[in-house]
Amino acid sequence: MVLAERNTTDVVRNGRRSRGPSPNTHTTGGVTNSASLVGSGNNSGHSGNANANEKTTTAVPGAGTPESSDDDNSTKRNGKSKAKQSEYEEKIRVGRDYQAVCPPLVPEAERRPEQMNERALLVWSPTKEIPDLKLEEYISVAKEKYGYNGEQALGMLFWHKHDLERAVMDLANFTPFPDEWTIEDKVLFEQAFQFHGKSFHRIRQMLPDKSIASLVKYYYSWKKTRHRSSAMDRQEKAIKAVVKDGSENGSEVGSNEESDNDDKIQKNRQVMEQLDKECETINVDDVLSKPAAANTESAQPRISARWLPDEIQVALLAIREYGKNFPTIAKVVATKTEAHVRTFYLNNRRRYNLDQIVKEYEAGKSEESGAEEQTEPAVDAAAAGAATASAPSAADSTSAASATADRKQSTENSNNGVETMQESLPKKEDPKKPELAAAVLKIGVAEAADAVATVASSTASGVIGAATSASKPSTSATITIIDESDTATNSSSDVVTTGLATSTGSSALSSTTSAPASKTQTSSEELSAQKSNPASGIAAIGAATGGGQTANSSGSKRDSSVLPVAEQPPAKKIALSTGGGSSVAEFLAN
């Protein structure tokens, strides 16, 4: 009795059914068990057994019914409700009532496919009439010659009801829509996606030949298969190619049959084997002999899409220096491509005020070009002025050279006259020759000083010299004075050749002479003075620039009447001429 009550209390707890499986799941079994327990425990009477059986029977339907199952109990143990699970997960429906009812098959004659809402378009259906070899030839022609892909070529063939000739003839009439993405397009899309994200309008700026719909379509197909790092993906593919070439067992890396861990282990093993082989083949001497090449390879900057603060500063300075010359700016930054620089400019033009920087660059460039255009006429004018100035100076130098040549010629002629005259004189005049030579030497010195002064004055005033040379030819006054006395008084011949010069030239001539004389007297006292001082015999005659007057032409004539007539030598001529051609005076000395 006690055991039966305990069992009933375990089954029913405060009016709730136990979570665990009930020991009295079946009624008959429960009654039998309880009866046996009670019978074994107490044999006093049948009334207690009846009450126990009633209690047991009343508790059994609540504890466990035939409708409940272990699945329901397991569901509640897991904390899941029936509403969250479909009825097909709870029980297996088997029987006629749970099968789908198929409609009867409609004959082909009664079918109306145009009345159906959802219809598929058949683009290809294989046939046995065309052999595989001809079909492959047709597809290759469509690909290589007309740019079709395999599906488009087969669709054209099916459109013409498997007629190869008509399909080949019709291939040229249609241009297939190229929706293929090349490797360059894919790389550009990845870079643009890293910069702009899902802003397809900005991505289209880097891929102008693609439409927005094509970009969106490719994005969703690329999103499913892309990896976190495309650079690592390319490196992994390169390693796979190396491993496949160097693997001895020929097994493919990363097969679907192996797990991820086995795949990684196999990759690492094969990479290690390949590296071991490379290490064995490396020659240490060659590596040591070429350290510079290794350094240059390692020193090459790595292209990165991420902009560091230093790179931003360099880019701003380069934009200020080169404007919108993006290739040059990319070379300056050295870690960015032209596309990176262009994108940086577009994204940060407001943040860093890049438009204003470019305007300043263009304004400075225009100013430089304008300055160059202005300097070119100035240089031409300066060159023309130099050429014009060189012409008078050349004329002055030419006139000075001609005047010097005239002076030299007249000096030589006078010297020749002196030599002939000295030969005609008696031999008793030989002791006086050194004095005559000294006088001639000083005349040459005076001529040299005159020439220097003339060149200096013409150089200092080039324009005045040019005007003077244009208005008047180079003038030269030649005065030949012949001292004719008796044999006791030595006759000396002083030849003075002066050129028409400015006051500077005349002052220079006067400074070279120690004792200039305006008149020549024939007294014996002056002759003796000339013998004692030969320089006094040199007459400095300066011709003025405006008048061209002769210096004391009448006064310079020697009064020869003092000497006796018997002692005078044959008559000699004294010629005085000016270079201007205005007057030529000849004097006859008796």
Curated annotation (Swiss-Prot):
Cellular component annotations (GO), alphabetically ordered: histone deacetylase complex; nucleus; transcription regulator complex; transcription repressor complex
A Gene Ontology biological process term: negative regulation of transcription by RNA polymerase II
Region (Disordered): 1-90, 244-266, 364-432, 503-590
Main location, first listed in the record: nucleus
Modified-residue entries (Phosphothreonine), positions: 25, 65, 375, 411
Modified residues (Phosphoserine): 18, 22, 34, 36, 68-69, 414, 560
Top-level lineage group: Eukaryota
Name the UniProt record assigns to this protein: REST corepressor
Regions of compositional bias (Polar residues) in chain numbering: 21-37, 411-423
Residues of the SANT domain: 176-227, 302-353
SUPFAM superfamilies per record: Homeodomain-like
PROSITE patterns referenced in this protein's UniProt entry, alphabetically: ELM2, SANT
All copies of domain ELM2, residue ranges: 90-175
Protein species of origin: Drosophila melanogaster
Gene Ontology molecular-function annotations: chromatin binding; transcription corepressor activity
Cellular compartment(s): Nucleus
Keywords: Chromatin regulator, Coiled coil, Nucleus, Phosphoprotein, Repeat, Repressor, Transcription, Transcription regulation
Tissue: Present in all of the tissues examined including both glia and neurons of the CNS (at protein level). Expressed ubiquitously in the embryo. In contrast, expression of isoform 3 is highly enriched in the nervous system.
Function: Essential component of a corepressor complex that represses transcription of neuron-specific genes in non-neuronal cells. The BHC complex is recruited by Ttk88 and probably acts by deacetylating and demethylating specific sites on histones, thereby acting as a chromatin modifier. May serve as a molecular beacon for the recruitment of molecular machinery that imposes silencing across a chromosomal interval.
Keyword check for tRNA-binding: no
Transmembrane segments: none
CDD domains linked: SANT (cd00167)
